[in-house]
Each structure stands twice: as structure tokens, then as C-alpha cells.
């Protein structure tokens, strides 16, 4: 098997991390590279373990997304996962993962990931963990009650778009990862691109994310913005919001990507080889970001 190559690419999460802190960006995409190998240098291994950490809110979102994916995958295969089974299995999974994280097992099996709160010994009351579980259960129950799910159930499987087959597309020579969570063709012959949300609304972030979905539809699926329905699904509230899009707004997204990619490449020692040197990536001066950074113990251990 050929060695993995650290290829430069763009995604919304990469863009956000770059804006938050250049040093954090370096640790995540360059310093941690290869840290999964058994014989990785100690520093790369530590950075890789820290990179895999999630806050408890991020963990909850991931659990919900994967639960929804289970349901949709089963439907595609002609099966129906009962709501009660999914809720029970998800809660059991959360207990297993919480226990493994609390025991810091992620330091020996880093790909499994751990919780930021456990690594940095952040006090969390038992009732707060229970509220997190209740939040996940609420999101899953709301998913089952969405009229949107009824529409998806009625849609012939050949009109589902298999997103996992094409996760990225080329944008001016850079791979861009911006695929939606789910997509299907509606009865009105419009392409519905779905984004599952579990947290508080963030209009700016959502606009960029949905714009990337519209760009994905144009570049990968060859569908014009006018035929696309961008659906933001708030599972916490059980609400669906449709966002209109047009060619003008798509141009704004292209402009954002071009500027972001140029800025990231400007920090590289050798852009063609995607070679980065840590000293070229400054630390943020906003200590509020530092306190909740996965790499705090390496970068600002005094906090």
C-alpha cells in the first residue's frame, strides 16, 4: 500500500480553524500528520491524540449525525430501524464511549478519540452529562417526527443521491470537501440538500456551509442553484428551514474560497509540496480560544 500523502485541501472546518488560530491550524493539519503510526515521533503522536479530542457538545452532535445516518442507510437497504431501538443503542454507545474517554483509553487507541473535558480535567456535573444525553435523545426523537423524513421514506431509492461516493470536488486545482449530509430529488424535480444541525443557530457559519453545498451541486452534480433546495434541519427544535440560493450568492462563495485558499497557501514554506514550518504560524492572542483549544497542553501549558 502506498504511503499516505498530506495533500492540501479546503473545507469549511479547515477555514474556521485557520481563522481561529494559525498555530492551532498547523498542529492540526501538519504537526499531527503521521501520528497514528505505531512508530510515530513522540510529538506527532501527542498532537494526533489531542487533535482527535472533542468537546462534549461536539461529541453529542457526532453521535446524533451517526444515528441519523444509521436510519437512512437502513431505509436505503429496505429496513426500518425502530425509534426505541435507536435511542437505546445510542445511549448505550454514549456510556461506552464516555467510560473509555474517562479512562483515557484514547492515548493507546487515538483514532477512537476522547473528550476534551476528560483530557483537561474540566469539572462537569453529573446532571450536565445527563442533560447532554437527554439532548441527544431529543434530537433523535425529533428526527423520527419530521415531515421531511416522511418525504424521504416515500422517495424512490434511485432518486437518493449517494453523497459518500463523491465527497470532494476540484476548485481551481484544490480539492474541496463540502458535501451535504444527505441529498435527494423531490417530487417537484428539485435537488434537496440537507444539513442536520444539533446546536444553537450560527447564521454566518450556516450560510457558508450551505453555500458550499450549492457549489457541490453545481460542480459535482451539475445542478444549477435555481433547482436546489438547501434545507437546514434543526433537530434540537424539530424545525426545517429552506434557504434560497442564486448564482450571485454562489459567486460570493467562490470568492470566499479563493481568498481562503490563497491565505492558507501563503503560510506554506513550499506550497507545491504542502510543506509547512511551525514558526511561520503565529499563535492567537485571544486566550478565550486558547482555553478551549485541543492543543493547549502543548502550546500554552500555563493556562
Model-derived features: positions:
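Short amphipathic alpha-helical segments and their helix-coil junctions
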Residues: 3-9, 28-51, 119, 189-194, ...
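Short, charged/polar micro-motifs that form catalytic or ligand-binding hotspots
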Residues: 8, 12-17, 50-58, 62, ...
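An acidic intrinsically disordered interaction segment
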Residues: 15-39, 170-183, 258-263
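Nuclease catalytic cores
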Residues: 15-31, 40-76, 87, 91, ...
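A short beta-strand motif that forms part of the nucleic acid-binding face
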Residues: 31, 196-200, 234, 247
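Non-catalytic protein-protein interaction segments used by genome-maintenance enzymes to assemble
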Residues: 36-40, 157-218, 272
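A non-catalytic, helix-rich entry segment at domain boundaries
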Residues: 67-161
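Metal-dependent nuclease catalytic regions and adjoining charged, substrate-binding loops involved
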Residues: 145, 172, 205, 219-303
Amino acid at each position: 500500500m502506498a504511503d499516505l500523502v498530506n495533500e492540501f485541501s479546503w473545507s469549511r472546518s479547515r477555514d474556521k480553524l485557520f481563522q481561529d488560530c494559525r498555530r492551532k491550524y498547523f498542529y492540526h493539519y501538519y504537526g499531527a500528520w503521521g501520528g497514528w503510526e505505531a512508530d510515530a515521533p513522540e510529538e506527532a503522536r501527542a498532537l494526533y491524540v489531542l487533535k482527535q479530542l472533542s468537546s462534549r457538545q461536539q461529541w453529542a452532535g457526532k453521535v446524533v449525525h451517526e444515528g441519523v445516518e444509521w436510519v437512512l442507510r437502513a431505509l436505503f437497504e429496505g429496513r426500518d430501524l425502530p425509534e426505541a431501538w435507536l435511542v437505546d443503542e445510542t445511549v448505550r454507545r454514549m456510556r461506552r464511549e464516555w467510560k473509555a474517554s474517562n479512562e483515557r483509553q484514547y492515548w493507546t487507541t487515538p483514532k477512537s478519540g476522547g473528550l476534551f473535558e476528560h483530557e483537561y480535567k474540566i469539572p462537569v456535573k453529573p446532571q450536565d452529562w445527563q442533560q447532554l444525553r437527554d439532548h441527544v435523545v431529543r434530537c433523535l426523537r425529533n428526527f423520527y417526527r419530521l415531515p421531511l423524513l416522511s418525504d424521504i421514506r416515500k422517495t424512490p431509492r434511485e432518486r437518493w443521491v449517494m453523497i459518500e461516493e463523491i465527497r470532494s470536488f476540484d476548485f481551481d486545482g484544490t480539492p474541496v470537501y463540502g458535501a451535504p449530509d444527505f441529498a435527494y430529488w423531490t417530487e417537484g424535480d428539485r435537488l434537496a440538500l440537507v444539513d442536520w444541525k444539533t446546536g444553537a443557530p450560527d447564521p454566518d457559519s450556516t450560510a457558508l456551509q450551505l453555500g458550499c453545498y450549492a457549489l457541490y451541486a453545481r460542480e459535482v452534480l451539475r445542478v444549477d442553484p435555481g433547482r436546489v433546495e438547501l434545507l437546514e434541519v434543526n433537530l434540537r427544535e424539530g424545525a426545517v428551514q429552506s434557504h434560497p440560493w442564486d448564482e450571485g450568492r454562489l459567486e460570493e462563495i467562490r470568492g470566499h474560497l479563493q481568498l481562503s485558499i490563497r491565505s492558507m497557501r501563503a503560510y506554506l514554506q513550499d506550497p507545491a509540496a504542502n510543506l509547512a514550518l511551525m514558526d511561520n504560524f503565529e499563535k492567537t492572542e485571544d486566550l478565550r480560544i486558547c482555553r478551549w483549544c485541543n492543543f493547549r497542553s502543548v502550546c500554552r501549558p500555563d493556562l
